[in-house]
Each structure stands twice: as structure tokens, then as C-alpha cells.
Regions:
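NAD(P)H-binding glycine-rich loop region in Rossmannoid oxidoreductase-like domains
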Residues: 1-43, 47, 51
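Conserved Rossmann-fold NAD(P)-dependent oxidoreductase catalytic core, especially the SDR/UDP-sugar
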Residues: 19, 43-93
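Conserved beta-loop-beta element that borders a ligand/cofactor-binding pocket
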Residues: 64, 101-125
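A conserved pocket-lining segment of Rossmann-fold NAD(P)-dependent short-chain dehydrogenase/reductase
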Residues: 85-88, 135-156, 160
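Substrate-positioning beta->alpha
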Residues: 99, 132, 149-169, 176
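Mid/C-terminal beta-alpha module of Rossmann-like enzyme folds, strongest
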Residues: 164-231, 248, 253, 263-279
Length: 279
């Protein structure tokens, strides 16, 4: 958030073939405005971009999000765009990622080779930050998940995203954006796969979205008192109900991007959580 904090990181970049991967950010499903999310996702990106230009960095790969992309009418698959506007997307997180992506791409006019990747719902092992799908897996395995909700989303393995980012560094084209998605999966299917992987009891209660939406404000307040991130908020329920599909055909074609089966991701996540003593 402070330009001065980047000086040591960028020291000595001048005159060298340097590529910066900007993947710092806060993933938030909060329904209310959060200054910290804005400061990190938008102001932080501006500071990194400005430092790249100032220090003569050759290449910047900006890790955006599929949330920065406007939805298509009728649930049509979402593909890449080169126009980003906070007004075209819903929710604080999406708006911050759209604003940050627009600023990063505009730096091409200042001589910076900018490329953008848009991961979908990142999941997988090695999640020390307690991401939302990891929390769902953990709650299922420990018997704390009493009910699921209708809806679904596109989930992608963090290891496939990492490989896609490196491929973008090497094979991506300046000024281009690449969706790094996985596959669409309903919450019901996620829970069924976890049952098969772990042998734990099934979650048989699935809340309709209208009921989950009605309870979301109380849920957010409850988890705020516990100082824990809620699994479901008004914004996350909007996302689960959107039915959004994302095409990674461009990344597959130009970057050689591939994804592993989602069941493998869940099994590896469960195994890692066990090794960590979290389940």
C-alpha cells in the first residue's frame, strides 16, 4: 500500500531482464465496503505498476480474477475482454479487481509489457490462508458442516494456476488477457465427492438459495463476532447462483494451459489438511 515499501524490492531492476508477477491481493466475499480490500487490491496494484515503469521493468504479469470480467446474458460462457470497468461487475471484490486490471493494462502506453491472467475459484493443497473452499472441506471432514447450499462455481487447482502464470510469462502476448479456469461444479457435487474421498457422512440438507440469502446477514454478523470468515455471505451466494461458466480455450491454445480432474484436487487437499493436523 506504500510506494516506499517497494523500493527495496525493485532495487537493481534497471537494465536487467526482469519479470514481475503481481499476485498479492485480498480475496473477499464481504458484502460491505472494506477499505483494506480496496487499498491492497487497487492502490497496491497501482504502486506495483508505477514501480515497474519507474524502474524500467521489462514485463509484468498481473494476476486478476474472473470476477473482473462482466457476466454474459443467459449464462453464456465468459471469455476474455480488454475493457474493464468497476461499474460492469457486482460486488466489492469484483470492482477492485476490475479497477486494478484496467490500471495495469493502461501501463502499456507507458512502455510496460503487461499481461493479465484471470483465475477462477482457486483451491487445492498448501492453503495456509484458510480459503473458502478449503474451509468448506475442513468443515465437512470435521463434521461441522450441517448443510450445504444450492448453486455452484468454477473451481481450479492452484497448481494449474501457477503453471498457467509461468506459461503466461514465457508464451503470453503483450496486452493480452488469459482466463485460467477449471470446471464448473455444484456445491452438492463437491460434497458428494468429499463423501467418496473421505468416507465421512453425507451432508443431506441443501438449503435453497432464497433461504440462505435470508440468513446471510445474520451469518455474517455471527462470524464477525467469532472473528472468523463466514462461508456464505450475500455476495458469495450471488456468485454461487450466477451459474457463471468461464472458457479457458485461449489459454489452452496460446499457453498450453491444462487442468487436472477436480476430484484429484479435493483428494490432495484432504491429504494435505490431514498432514497439517487440521482434520
Amino acid at each position: 500500500r506504500s510506494p516506499a515499501s517497494l523500493e527495496a524490492l525493485f532495487a537493481g531492476a534497471e537494465g536487467r531482464d526482469v519479470t514481475v508477477i503481481h499476485c498479492a491481493g485480498i480475496v473477499s466475499i464481504a458484502s460491505r465496503f472494506d477499505q483494506n480490500v480496496y487499498d491492497v487490491n487497487v492502490t497496491g496494484t497501482k504502486n506495483v505498476v508505477d514501480a515497474c515503469v519507474r524502474r524500467g521493468v521489462k514485463k509484468l504479469v498481473h494476476v486478476s480474477s474472473v470476477h473482473a470480467l462482466p457476466e454474459k446474458p443467459g449464462g453464456a460462457p465468459v471469455s476474455e475482454t480488454d475493457v474493464f470497468s468497476p461499474g460492469a461487475v457486482v460486488g466489492l471484490y469484483a470492482k477492485t479487481k476490475a479497477a486494478a486490471t484496467a490500471y495495469a493494462l493502461a501501463a502499456r502506453a507507458r512502455g510496460l509489457d503487461v499481461r493479465v491472467v484471470h483465475p477462477s475459484g482457486i483451491c487445492g493443497p498448501y492453503d495456509y490462508g484458510h480459503g473458502h473452499l478449503t474451509q468448506l472441506v475442513q468443515d465437512f471432514c470435521t463434521g461441522r458442516l450441517a448443510a450445504g447450499v444450492d448453486g455452484g462455481y468454477d473451481f481450479v487447482d492452484v497448481r494449474d494456476v501457477a503453471a498457467g502464470i509461468l506459461a503466461c510469462c514465457e508464451r503470453g502476448r503483450p496486452g493480452e488477457c488469459y482466463i485460467l479456469s477449471g470446471r464448473y461444479c455444484t456445491v452438492r457435487d463437491v460434497l458428494a465427492m468429499l463423501h467418496r474421498i473421505t468416507g465421512r457422512r453425507r451432508v443431506r440438507v441443501m438449503l435453497p438459495l432464497w433461504l440462505a440469502r435470508a440468513a446471510a446477514p445474520l451469518s455474517e454478523q455471527y462470524y464477525r463476532l467469532l472473528r472468523q470468515p463466514p462461508l456464505y455471505t450475500a455476495y458469495s451466494l450471488y456468485t454461487l447462483s450466477s451459474g457463471a461458466r468461464f472458457s479457458h480455450a485461449k489459454a489452452a491454445r496460446e499457453l498450453g494451459y491444462t487442468t487436472r480432474p477436480f476430484g484429484t484436487t479435493l483428494a490432495d487437499t484432504v491429504a494435505w489438511l490431514r498432514r497439517q493436523g487440521r482434520i
